[in-house]
Amino acid sequence: MAMKIGTAAFKERVSEGIDNEFMRGAVSGAQERLRTRRLQAAEELGNWEDWRSHAEEIRQHVLDNLDFYLEQLAENVANRGGHVFFAETAEEASSYIRDVIRQKNAKKIVKSKSMVTEEINMNEVLEEEGCEVTETDLGEYILQIDDHDPPSHIVAPALHKNKEQIRDVFKERLEYKQTEKPEELVMHARSVLRKKFLEADVGITGCNFAIADTGSVSLVTNEGNGRLVSALPKTQITVMGMERIVPSFSEFEVLVSMLTRSAVGQRLTSYITALTGPRQQGEADGPEEFHLVVVDNGRSRILGTEFQSVLQCIRCAACINVCPVYRHVGGHSYGSIYSGPIGAVLSPLLGGYDEYKELPYASSLCAACTEACPVKIPLHELLLKHRQNIVEKEGKAPISEKLAMKAFGLGSSSPSLYKMGSKWAPAAMTPFTEDDKISKGPGPLKEWTAIRDFPAPHKSRFRDWFKDREKQKGEE
């Protein structure tokens, strides 16, 4: 699965999301629960704004010194017997992973949750190679066996499905014969996945944060699948975005605390795992061979630009969990594996405006996302910058909008035209006016007034009122 999901036009995706009542209900309920838990967890920690500022400083420092920390990380991974590959593009990353699989003559792969592996289209590349790739995160596994349904949320990928739908998928694909009770569904998935872990030739993981001064990679999970993926297969491949790095475990401690509280409202997740290279002499488990793939895929182009702060993201989805637009349209409407406010900023940077020019407009600019972000990314400001770029640099504004703005500019800059327009506007809008509101506007106002009323022009103009007032004062 590449970064782009689906081929439908943006308006079609949005309409489909709005028409999906179950999805909107599920998203709304999840947002309320996760928001409440996040606020409680933040209050428990205390001095939340100070923690946010500290986390922001850590991420900014890393980005400003990224070359140093990446070099340090690579050196320490190599010192522990691991292999490091820096991939400039998605194709380079997936090709390197495919080559490692070929060298090992591996056919069965288990994989923990990773957004960047979806970004580089890794699963599809390996499946074309004849490999069986099994997602072991429960949400991702459900989507995989349901005809590779795309994820709709960064943290909860199967948020758009209910337990009855999941039961039906299990019955069709896994010969499931029990009820839709979550406990029974989980136990059945567990029994299936355990066999996959034991049979796997290669394990592939993502990386929440890499620790530069030790050469470690970390996995933050609630299911424990990350540990099995990294401990049982003889070969482990970890894939990370080049920005997902911290200087030491001291900074890791701060960021993982912010991550777990912001993502799911927990002090810590059930499992926090740090892996440092292949199995060393005297160690009981772990892979015999370890590969770290560091993915650029457009990230270096963002460094040093007005959008650099988006690379501070720790993938907690706190912005998604407060977004009113996401609440109504869902994750699939964004057409990218990165949805919500963070996706609306990041997707155009990685995939280009031609593919994602609509996403910066999928926002009310209420700034709830910015307030929720644990590393203080100014998301609503970055969305505005995208809009400016789309119009000024890319020339993507619709022709109708350009003509309307030119006409407005011409009329506003000419006293005689402005006077004439303000005189005739009330009469021109009369057929569309009811109770001093335009409820079915013409032309550009049609879509706007389909869901809201537009104030009708006043019949008396300010210039006329002022003229009459001055006349009355003179008569007095």
Curated annotation (Swiss-Prot):
Keywords: 4Fe-4S, Electron transport, Iron, Iron-sulfur, Metal-binding, Repeat, Transport. This is Lactate utilization protein B. It comes from Bacillus velezensis (strain DSM 23117 / BGSC 10A6 / LMG 26770 / FZB42) (Bacillus amyloliquefaciens subsp. plantarum). The keyword Ribonucleoprotein does not apply. Residues 304-334, 353-382 form the 4Fe-4S ferredoxin-type domain. One of its GO terms (biological process) is lactate metabolic process. Belongs to the LutB/YkgF family. GO terms for molecular function: 4 iron, 4 sulfur cluster binding; metal ion binding. [4Fe-4S] cluster 2 binds at residues 323, 366, 369. Is involved in L-lactate degradation and allows cells to grow with lactate as the sole carbon source. Has probably a role as an electron transporter during oxidation of L-lactate. HAMAP family: LutB. The keyword Iron applies. Pfam families: Fer4_8, LUD_dom, LutB_C.
